[in-house]
Design a protein with these regions (language model features):
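N-terminal amphipathic/basic leader segments beginning at the initiator methionine
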Residues: 1-19
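Active-site C-terminal subdomain of aminotransferase-like
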Residues: 7, 171-240
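Conserved N-terminal alpha-helix of the aminotransferase class I/II PLP-enzyme fold
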Residues: 15-60, 64, 81-85, 234-243
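Conserved PLP-anchoring active-site segment centered on the Schiff-base-forming lysine
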Residues: 65-80
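Short helix-loop-beta junction
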Residues: 87-95
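Active-site phosphate-binding strand-loop segment of PLP-dependent enzymes
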Residues: 102-155
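Conserved active-site segment immediately N-terminal to the catalytic lysine
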Residues: 160-171
């Protein structure tokens, strides 16, 4: 029950302006403001913005951060793509050594040590929320790090700061236009991916066109973020009560 990519608000349109992204002081101020607010929402101190869907951000996250033994939590279509990305990364970059794909309701049976636990906070395909607090407890128990697909949870759910790295898009719970994606984290990865578009550092250094207008669309929305978030929560509650009747 998250807002879909088709969401279009007055604030999205008002925020749009001609933007180039390099040597554009007006845009630089907007981007700094938006990224600072996004870091505050997620609780991370570093963020990368890029042009594309959340799946692109997640592929960069998987390719640059994951290594060693990886446990992926199976929840549905969204976790399937994390699994596919991890398999590809294991094949082509050789940093991931082993992958296990385990159903979300069988995690109590996992006792082995992993380098990374990967999963979706909210699995939109079946309307399932796996509390990030429980994933954090699992991470600590398995002595691992936590990577989260926050596509359907960012902006609407709490405690994303419990994850070591997250990936998400500019729409859905952030109420921006489609076309922007973000990776938030606290520590830079040690891995180095040579493919230009999958290299996290190339995006950090802004070596390619960024999601300029998606970011502009977030400027006005994030100023009223709590209002829009509350509206979604009320609608979710009403839909739940209606279905219970």
């Amino acid at each position: 029950m998250t807002p879909g990519p088709a969401s279009l608000l007055t604030e999205n349109i008002i925020g749009l302006e001609p933007s180039f992204g390099r040597g554009d002081e007006s845009y630089d101020k907007i981007e700094k403001q938006v990224l600072n607010k996004l870091k505050k929402i997620s609780g991370h101190n570093q963020i990368v913005r890029l042009q594309g869907a959340a799946s692109f951000a997640l592929e960069i996250m998987v390719s640059n951060f994951l290594y060693g033994k990886v446990l992926i939590i199976k929840t549905g279509i969204y976790s399937d793509r994390l699994h596919d990305m991890s398999l590809a990364s294991k094949k082509y970059y050789k940093k991931i050594k082993k992958i296990e794909y385990v159903d979300w309701d069988k995690l109590d049976k996992i006792n082995k040590k992993f380098d990374w636990v990967v999963g979706c906070y909210v699995e939109t395909s079946i309307g399932l929320k796996v509390p990030i607090e429980e994933l954090y407890i699992l991470k600590k128990r398995l002595k691992s790090k936590l990577a989260i697909d926050a596509t359907a949870s960012i902006g609407l759910e709490k405690n994303h700061k419990l994850a070591d790295v997250i990936g998400y898009s500019s729409c859905k719970g952030l109420f921006g236009l489609t076309g922007g994606a973000f990776i938030a984290f606290n520590k830079l990865p040690k891995k180095y991916i040579t493919l230009f578009n999958l290299n996290l550092f190339n995006h950090l250094e802004k070596k390619m066109t960024g999601p300029y207008h998606a970011i502009c669309s977030l400027k006005g929305v994030l100023n009223k973020y709590q209002k829009f978030k509350y509206s979604v929560q009320i609608n979710k509650k009403k839909n739940y009560e209606k279905n219970e009747e």
